């Protein structure tokens, strides 16, 4: 049985410009005492074709964690567009919110992300070099994919 139960994740600042931070408002319940900190991280998938294009946007340790309801806001920088293949900058990708205990991932929340131009003219005729200031990021927060993994807690 998991000692931590994710109860809610709200994504603020959505939709937003590509260069805006991701802001996750995370609520979880600690149902049994844990001795170590929780590690939370956000990973942006830069290309479905190559895992080396994935970017860890940020990682934090949270603790000590009290038994009961807990909540915090996790704000992370946007991905570095220079590390994303030009052909993968627009369209659908994924961002993961992951929580680990003692180095073992026990929950992963995946969200589809659609990056597209604000303006119809740019959608119809995208520039040769992507203009990040005109790209909108829309996290599909109504349909997260939540995966739990069994781990050794203590």
Curated annotation (Swiss-Prot):
Question: What molecular functions are annotated in GO for this chain?
Answer: histone binding
User: What compartments host this protein?
Assistant: Nucleus
**Which superkingdom heads the taxonomic lineage of this protein's source?**
Eukaryota
Q: Which GO terms describe its biological process?
A: DNA replication-dependent chromatin assembly; nucleosome assembly
Task: Report the SUPFAM superfamilies cross-referenced here.
Answer: ASF1-like
Indicate the principal place this protein occupies in or around the cell. nucleus
Assigned protein family: Belongs to the ASF1 family.
Q: What is the official name of this protein in its record? A: Histone chaperone asf1
Which species is this UniProt entry from? Dictyostelium discoideum (Social amoeba)
